[in-house]
Amino acid sequence: MEKPPSPPPPPRAQTSPGLGKVGVLPNRRLGAVRGGLMSSPPGRRARLASPGTSRPSSEAREELRRRLRDLIEGNRVMIFSKSYCPHSTRVKELFSSLGVVYNILELDQVDDGASVQEVLTEISNQKTVPNIFVNKVHVGGCDRTFQAHQNGLLQKLLQDDSAHDYDLIIIGGGSGGLSCAKEAANLGKKVMVLDFVVPSPQGTTWGLGGTCVNVGCIPKKLMHQAALLGHALQDAKKYGWEYNQQVKHNWEAMTEAIQSHIGSLNWGYRVTLREKGVTYVNSFGEFVDLHKIKATNKKGQETFYTASKFVIATGERPRYLGIQGDKEYCITSDDLFSLPYCPGCTLVVGASYVGLECAGFLAGLGLDVTVMVRSVLLRGFDQEMAEKVGSYLEQQGVKFQRKFTPILVQQLEKGLPGKLKVVAKSTEGPETVEGIYNTVLLAIGRDSCTRKIGLEKIGVKINEKNGKIPVNDVEQTNVPHVYAIGDILDGKPELTPVAIQAGKLLARRLFGVSLEKCDYINIPTTVFTPLEYGCCGLSEEKAIEMYKKENLEVYHTLFWPLEWTVAGRDNNTCYAKIICNKFDNERVVGFHLLGPNAGEITQGFAAAMKCGLTKQLLDDTIGIHPTCGEVFTTLEITKSSGLDITQKGCUG
């Protein structure tokens, strides 16, 4: 940013070359000025539309739009104003006091000014003047410009980044990276996204969109749905549906349909980036200097790019055991969702949410499934809820082998699937066990993709224990122009919606007129096991750690969904509880639900928790009957009372 001149020079007019490029606008009030207001001499008059028309044709309108964008993109500060407007005068005086060169177009002194303002409104979504753009970013009107000046955002926008190829380069084309890229492009910035999928040890790769779209949330939820449909077919007979044909599942048909949908999403992302003017490069990004990055494509060809700012959004990949046969014969979630053959008898190693979700839908599709657990289920989640999830999985036929970890995977037979022998050792002693499986699925955690992108060359610090990147409350690393979002952040939730929100807000802070930060508190999530587990806020263990047990009240109950009654599904399996801070008006600090459609139910309660939900507010809420969600409006029994919470029927 240029320093304000002292004393300010007298006003002087400079004719801007920008209008000459536009051509359709008379050069009456467009000029460049430093340190004072400007009154440029009138220039050649040209009409916006053909003589005799009151409104430009569609072709002329598009031409006008293009030329207005040329003005916005070609000038550091572009002010659309009216000569008699006092608010416009205030803005001009502000930039003059800052010693900043600005360009103006007085809409009351151009031919067809109303049409110009109409198209400008479509571009900026602002009907009034002054209408200010700084470095291609729409700042807004007078009040927003002064607000941006007061909070420092205007000075940030005025920084000249023209020395670099791009305003922003994002490494990683997942949910967070794409969200950040699209928002930055919306703010008028020149953006590049680098995305490259290193094939899994089994050779699996995928398109643009990251883990969630390709090998995570989307295919996982669709396979979960496939399993639920199978269960619904069993219930259907109790509801009077008759069918004689034997029902069986076709794995190949399911994966083909799911991959077709994912392919459409990949293409949609590429189209969206193109429409927004974001450069997408399918290459591996690696820092070589503070503002310089090397992009290597699959052919090994290298290209170098520079940017003013960088966002690291590289995500994570599944971890391997580091034992004989793991990478040769085991698969991970990277491979499962596009597996071209039915996995058959499957051993799932690990009891993370990924492991239990996969075990759940595989069992729901009729497969023989065993889960090998080293320690606890769903580490980091409420452990009472985790054990209930495990119990329901066992009811659905999933077998658990606890306190064991594999030490060898050996191929006995080749095939699709083949046959594998797994040798596992007890975590509590010398005991070993063996098992024969068609497929071994590893779900033991994920590693951040941060160690091979040249961070050490520019001094970005990482947590050496887990590869994650420490950032401040605005996602900034220890290197000021380098930021990070998503699963690679140290100590932050590894959830797609979190990355999307963080990416969008980061772009707005970097290039817009917003100071809003991502709220990492009270984030809802759902584990999509056959009986879904939704939660928001603190686990019971974490709440006790933070508030002490004597300061908490836990309300809970079992319940029986109406839909389960006719089908004869087990009563007293679904469970709901809230954890309340007794000394903060019984504010709800933890929300937990095990039941059908838990994700859909939890979403709404998460919004309520952000607004300070209390037990009294729940009591005052009239429930929708008959639904599962209404159970939270009638909670009466506390854990401390020790009273029985079993239910006799669906209505309590």
Swiss-Prot record:
Q: What is the effect of changing U651C?
A: Thioredoxin reductase activity reduced to 21%. Glutaredoxin activity reduced to 14%. Glutathione reductase activity reduced to 18%
Q: Which PANTHER family does the entry mention?
A: GLUTATHIONE REDUCTASE, THIOREDOXIN-DISULFIDE REDUCTASE
Localization of this protein? Cytoplasm; Nucleus; Microsome; Endoplasmic reticulum
Name of the protein in question: Thioredoxin reductase 3
Organism, scientific name: Mus musculus (Mouse)
Task: Tell me the function of this protein.
Answer: Displays thioredoxin reductase, glutaredoxin and glutathione reductase activities. Catalyzes disulfide bond isomerization. Promotes disulfide bond formation between GPX4 and various sperm proteins and may play a role in sperm maturation by promoting formation of sperm structural components.
Q: Mark the residues carrying the PTM Asymmetric dimethylarginine.
A: R34
Q: How is the cofactor bound?
A: Binds 1 FAD per subunit.
Required cofactors, per record?
FAD
- Share any extra remarks: The thioredoxin reductase active site is a redox-active disulfide bond. The selenocysteine residue is also essential for catalytic activity.
Residues covered by the Glutaredoxin domain: 65-165
Task: Give the similarity note.
Answer: Belongs to the class-I pyridine nucleotide-disulfide oxidoreductase family.
Tissues expressing this chain: Expressed preferentially in testis where it is found in spermatids and spermatocytes but not in sperm. In elongating spermatids, expressed at the site of mitochondrial sheath formation. Low levels in other tissues including heart, lung, liver, kidney, brain, muscle and prostate.
Cysteinyl-selenocysteine (Cys-Sec) cross-link site: C650-U651
- Give me the Gene Ontology terms describing cellular component: endoplasmic reticulum; nucleus
* Cystine crosslinks: C212-C217
| Modification Phosphoserine occurs at | S50
SUPFAM superfamilies the UniProt entry points to: FAD/NAD(P)-binding domain (SSF51905), FAD/NAD-linked reductases, dimerisation (C-terminal) domain (SSF55424), Thioredoxin-like (SSF52833)
Residues modified as N6-succinyllysine are K388
Q: Where does FAD bind?
A: 167-196
**What catalytic activity does the UniProt entry give for this protein?**
[thioredoxin]-dithiol + NADP(+) = [thioredoxin]-disulfide + NADPH + H(+)
Skewed-composition ranges (Pro residues): 1-12
Domain comment in the entry? The N-terminal glutaredoxin domain does not contain the C-X-X-C redox-active motif normally found in glutaredoxins but activity may be mediated through a single cysteine. The C-terminal Cys-Sec motif of one subunit of the homodimer may transfer electrons from the thiol-disulfide center to the glutaredoxin domain of the other subunit.
